[in-house]
Amino acid sequence: MAKLHDYYKDEVVKKLMTEFNYNSVMQVPRVEKITLNMGVGEAIADKKLLDNAAADLAAISGQKPLITKARKSVAGFKIRQGYPIGCKVTLRGERMWEFFERLITIAVPRIRDFRGLSAKSFDGRGNYSMGVREQIIFPEIDYDKVDRVRGLDITITTTAKSDEEGRALLAAFDFPFRK
């Protein structure tokens, strides 16, 4: 079991129960899933780029990514409906906790010119989204074998009812928010 999951059960639940005066342990917000998404718009011209992006995402997450396809045709972007244009991974359970721990302790501090993550990136329902400009911040990616530096979107979905609860949940994990 991941250390962060044990920490959540032992420390975070107690802290949030006193902070928000919950009656039951089941009311305490928890991390439900983490979604990693990599949009590869250049895949229209070269299908190999999408394979490389999927391989990077598989190395980062430890799980085979789902290839996402265009929902509708857009002439301005030269894409047709059904074209493969990206890949995504949804992490739950044990893999989610392990990735979350690696994200907080290893990957985020390796971001260039890092001054903290914005605390305003909540969606109104307690879910947090962030963008990473370079996939090379993850130690699983070998810098010498990277064909192109790509970014990815990371969404942390929680059971929190409000942004305040979601922010308190992530702050309890020492999430590096900007002061």
Curated annotation (Swiss-Prot):
Keywords: Acetylation, Ribonucleoprotein, Ribosomal protein, RNA-binding, rRNA-binding, tRNA-binding
PTM-bearing positions, type N6-acetyllysine: K3
InterPro entries according to UniProt: Ribosomal_uL5 (IPR002132), Ribosomal_uL5_bac-type (IPR020930), Ribosomal_uL5_C (IPR031309), Ribosomal_uL5_CS (IPR020929), Ribosomal_uL5_dom_sf (IPR022803), Ribosomal_uL5_N (IPR031310)
Keyword set includes Transcription: no
NCBIfam families: PRK00010.1 (NF000585)
HAMAP family: Ribosomal_uL5_B (MF_01333_B)
Name of the protein this chain belongs to: Large ribosomal subunit protein uL5
Species whose genome carries this gene: Escherichia coli (strain K12)
Higher taxonomy: Bacteria, Pseudomonadati, Pseudomonadota, Gammaproteobacteria, Enterobacterales
